[in-house]
Amino acid sequence: MTISETWLLPDGVADVLPEQAQVIEKLRREAIDFLAVRGYQLVYTPFIEYIESLSSLSESNQDLDLVTFKVIDQLSGRLLGIRADMTPQVARIDAHVRPVEGVARYCYAGTVLHTKPQNFNATRAPLQLGAELYGHDSIEADVEMVDVMLGLIENAYTLQGAHLDLGHVGLFRSLVKYAGLSKNEEHELSDLYQRKALPELAEFTQNLNMGSDFYALGRYASDLDALQAHLSADILKDAEFDAALNALKTTLEQIKNRWPALNVGIDVVELRSYHYHTGLMYAVYAPNRAAPLAQGGRYDGIGEHFGRARPATGFSCDLYALGANQFAEIETVVAPKGTEADLLKAIANARSEGLRVVQLLGNDDLSSIPYATHQLVLQNGQWNIEKI
């Protein structure tokens, strides 16, 4: 193996250098503080767990199982998984480790690992930050979570030009149930909706039970008024469909009231991981970026695998994506070598003010210190900081 080969990193992973690492860490700290004052308590979860725990969502979210790295535990011989998402771990905490009665709010930040990138040009080792609310199945809880997500993105990135998409899997799911479709028909419809293939959708729904309703769902996915006008009276009377539609309307109205300058849209056939989500879904997008800045939704019953099914809603984002193309201007104060008490006190005082101070070692000079922008100099018996 040549020396150059030892420099190579696997596809989809990268070093984060000081100019950007400083930005990322600032985002992380500010985000955790933002969530903390809203009642979201920080938890740390292990990087590895037995695969049975991490795969607690595998039946409802097979994508998660596919992106989870698996290794053999050298101590027990059991199969371990490297976390690809922290939500199953927080669900375990809520269900078993810290079974709070009533509403529980958690937040987290840490590296997760994926077997393959989740979208174009994405890292396989995102720095995932998220917040979750357990124990309340109300619209108010959903609105709170969307509101918190938007506030966090506004602080960490910007909402200027951003677009919020709202959807509700209950519309599609209740229509499928009402029509009595087979699993194959359900999967085919989901694929057509995801591809926005209206001509194919029109052809496929011609001989489908409730076909005109399924076509209307795709054709008028972004206009609730037009959608209602083209749906049959039968499905509009269905209790589950009506509840989902009203929940989406109410959420849309409340979010628009809270964020009047934000561009908010509807997409009732945005069915990413619809087997995993159980209600409202939301994602916020920035201009000229295909992947969402943050996304989330309702996933009731997530703790059932751990013996305690509870209502739950939450969102997550990748701090690396939020900090992309942002670079800190690093400033460093260079102090001369020496052990004099007044010099050491001057260095300590500067550091207490939040300044980065590096003291020269041995034969070092200014040229040996990266990012040297200022120096500590002795003038008339006083140590002063001067720009280089």
From Swiss-Prot:
InterPro entries in the cross-refs: aa-tRNA-synth_II/BPL/LPL, HisRS-like_core, HisRS/HisZ, HisZ
UniProt entry tagged with the keyword Zinc-finger: no
Keywords on record: Amino-acid biosynthesis, Cytoplasm, Histidine biosynthesis
Cysteines joined through disulfide linkages: none
Entry annotated with the keyword S-adenosyl-L-methionine: no
Example GO BP: L-histidine biosynthetic process
One matching Pfam family: tRNA-synt_His
Main location: cytoplasm
SUPFAM superfamilies referenced in this protein's UniProt entry, alphabetically: Class II aaRS and biotin synthetases (SSF55681)
Cell location: Cytoplasm
GO cellular component terms, semicolon-separated: cytoplasm
Pathway in which this enzyme or protein is active: Amino-acid biosynthesis; L-histidine biosynthesis; L-histidine from 5-phospho-alpha-D-ribose 1-diphosphate: step 1/9
Subunit relationships: Heteromultimer composed of HisG and HisZ subunits.
Protein family (similarity comment): Belongs to the class-II aminoacyl-tRNA synthetase family. HisZ subfamily.
UniProt miscellaneous comment: This function is generally fulfilled by the C-terminal part of HisG, which is missing in some bacteria such as this one.
Known function: Required for the first step of histidine biosynthesis. May allow the feedback regulation of ATP phosphoribosyltransferase activity by histidine.
Protein name: ATP phosphoribosyltransferase regulatory subunit
